[in-house]
UniProtKB/Swiss-Prot annotation:
GO terms for molecular function: magnesium ion binding; myrcene synthase activity. The keyword Metal-binding applies. It comes from the Eukaryota. Binds 3 Mg(2+) or Mn(2+) ions per subunit. This is Linalool synthase TPS3, chloroplastic. A motif (DDXXD motif) lies at residues 345-349. Its cofactor is Mg(2+); Mn(2+). The Asp-Asp-Xaa-Xaa-Asp/Glu (DDXXD/E) motif is important for the catalytic activity, presumably through binding to Mg(2+). The gene is TPS3.
Length: 596
């Protein structure tokens, strides 16, 4: 439970959260899994009866195994990698050369948005450290104006530097309000809006005030057509969802097209961005074919006919969370984790009786293959697939690092299954919990803690034994990431019909409405407020409190971003409309045209 989110019904100003954020959620397709359950199953015994089983009505991206196995990407060839290395050296020279501070910041910002910054981590840190430690910066800021100040603030905070929000006080009048004359500077307003999302918990409301002011101004300037044409797409994009909340790999694909149209584009950066995108895509395709072969070898798709067979979608999650090409092994392991989570989720959602689910949960808690004898064969196979996967992962860790990680992996799966079981009990009893009761369980049932525990052992090498207690207790950064993922999921998968169907598994919107008597829109507004508060907590957790590496912290943040990516336009995981499909195709299967 995230104790700091306890005051769930406190009167609040929701502020301005991205103008189109989940605007279409009410029209999204509901996750039909829960509506397929039959309450009569709650009384079904394991023997002497054959309960009626339901199959999920899932609308998924086609995963033609033979076609996907035959994928061939020319950008895996050495000649493209060699050209990429030449371009990287030229960019390093740019970062090393003397230039105006604002130009340095703009170069770093472009590298990040083009998806190239992972190549230049040391160089970027060196440049930003120099800017941060320069004693003359306060005098320079007075000459910069709003745009450059906001850019500096955002980049420094993104990279963990302690920058006070008082940096914006020089743009306020004697009453403490932002000066009205700033409204004429749409570029400055855009960058103020983006910077305002780098807000930490327990800060004064300066950044919230900045966000409201900037959003209102940008929307007004758009309506009155007072935004420069080369900024219109960027402003609309930001108001839909802020940069800091976006899935960065998808953002890179979008920004490459925007950057190409800029009059001041750097041809070296543009060529490198396109080439690197395609090379990384080739690496991702290689990882995808590996995980597809693994999935076929488990036979889970054939044995669990009611479950979602969606390895492409599962892999898309891991690409959004850990996209660097050198992290292929971690991507493969985590795709397996997502696949197993999806299969087990469907067992609890649309297959198992309550008695069977209790047996399955106990077996996972005890980590005991002898506990599954009474279960249907498909549930036995699923348990053994999980059992073998976890034990194999733990074997590799023990062999290579001398650390037994089974207790931590087991606990994460046991906690997940217990949370699934609690939801099943609520369904079978027809009970609608309070919002706090729901969230205390739901941040675990969204599966983020289990995913992040496995992610830690994939990316932090060698394993730091001092970190394990924080992992076992689900450190704040894990809980915040999980809460954001849960709330975005609920916003994206809870249309009006879900609220009205008494038999469905309750979600946060329905819980809030029942407890407070609020209308659906007020409930959604409250969830958006909770998402913003969780982001503030996560900002503070990763900069001040987290014992983990920056790599792991980044994965936790990226998992939250994936929630916004997948559920922004409805249920992008279980019921895809054209938007999620197009995103998957553009990232995994469609290279960018690179002219020779």
């Amino acid at each position: 439970m995230i104790s700091s989110l306890n005051p769930l019904f406190t009167t609040h100003r929701s502020g301005v959260i991205a103008q189109q954020f989940f605007a279409s959620s009410a029209a999204a397709s509901i996750n039909s899994v829960s509506s397929l359950k039959i309450a009569a199953c709650s009384k079904t015994k394991l023997v002497d009866q054959s309960p009626l089983r339901q199959s999920g009505n899932h609308q998924l991206l086609s995963s033609d195994f033979n076609h996907l196995q035959s994928l061939k990407n020319d950008y895996a060839e050495e000649k493209y990698k060699s050209r990429c290395e030449v371009l990287k050296e030229q960019v390093k020279m740019m970062l090393d050369q003397e230039m105006d501070v604002v130009n340095q910041l703009e170069l770093i910002d472009d590298l990040q948005r083009l998806g190239l910054s992972y190549h230049f981590g040391d160089e970027i840190t060196s440049v930003l450290s120099g800017i941060y430690n320069r004693k003359s910066m306060n005098k320079m800021r007075n000459q910069w104006g709003l745009y450059a100040t906001c850019l500096e603030f955002r980049l420094l905070r993104q990279h963990g530097f302690d920058v006070s929000q008082e940096i914006f006080d020089c743009f306020k009048d004697e009453k403490g309000d932002f000066r009205p004359s700033l409204c004429e500077d749409s570029k400055g307003m855009l960058y103020l809006y983006e910077a305002s999302y780098l807000e930490s918990e327990n800060e004064e409301s300066n950044l919230e005030m900045a966000r409201r002011f900037a959003a209102k101004t940008l929307k007004k300037n758009l309506d009155e057509k007072r935004v420069d044409q080369d900024l219109v797409a960027l402003v609309q994009h930001a108001l839909e969802l802020p940069l800091h909340w976006r899935m960065m790999r998808l953002e890179a694909r979008w920004f490459i097209d925007i950057y190409e149209e800029r009059s001041n584009r750097n041809p070296i950066l543009l060529e490198l961005a396109k080439l690197d995108f395609n090379i990384v895509q080739a690496a991702h395709q290689n990882d995808l074919t590996y995980t597809l072969r693994w999935w076929r070898s488990t036979c889970l798709a054939e044995k669990l006919t009611f479950a979602r067979d969606m390895m492409v979608e599962n892999f898309f999650w891991t690409v959004g969370i850990i996209s660097d090409p050198q992290r292929g092994n971690g991507r493969r392991i985590l795709t397996k984790v997502v696949a197993l989570i999806t299969a087990i989720d469907d067992i609890y959602d649309c297959y198992g009786t309550l008695d069977e689910l209790e047996v399955f949960t106990t077996a996972v808690e005890r980590w005991d293959v002898n506990s599954i004898d009474q279960l249907p064969d498909c549930m036995k196979i699923c348990f053994l697939a999980l059992y073998n996967f976890v034990n194999e992962m733990a074997y590799d860790a023990l062999k290579e690092q001398g650390v037994n990680i089974i207790p931590y992996l087991r606990k994460s799966w046991a906690d997940l299954c217990k949370a699934y079981l609690q939801e099943a009990k609520w369904f079978f009893s027809g009970e609608v919990p309070t919002l706090q009761q729901y969230l205390n369980n739901a941040w675990i049932s969204i599966s983020a803690p289990a995913f992040l525990v496995h992610a830690y052992f994939c990316v932090d090498y060698p394993i730091n034994k001092d970190h394990l207690q924080y992992l076992d207790n689900y450190h704040k950064i894990i809980r915040c990431s999980a809460m954001i993922l849960r709330l975005t999921n609920d916003l994206g998968t809870s249309p009006e019909s879900e609220v009205l169907n008494v038999g469905d598994v309750p979600k946060s919107i329905r819980c809030y409405m029942k407890e407070t008597g609020a209308c659906e829109e007020k409930a959604r507004e409250h969830l958006r407020f909770l998402i913003t508060e969780a982001w503030k907590q996560m900002e503070e957790a990763q900069t001040l409190d987290s014992p983990f590496s920056s790599t792991f912290n980044g994965i936790a943040v990226n998992l939250a971003r994936m929630g916004l990516c997948m559920y922004q336009h409805g249920d992008g995981h279980g019921h895809q409309n054209s938007e999620p499909r197009d995103r998957i195709l553009s990232l995994l299967f469609e290279p960018i045209c690179c002219l020779a």
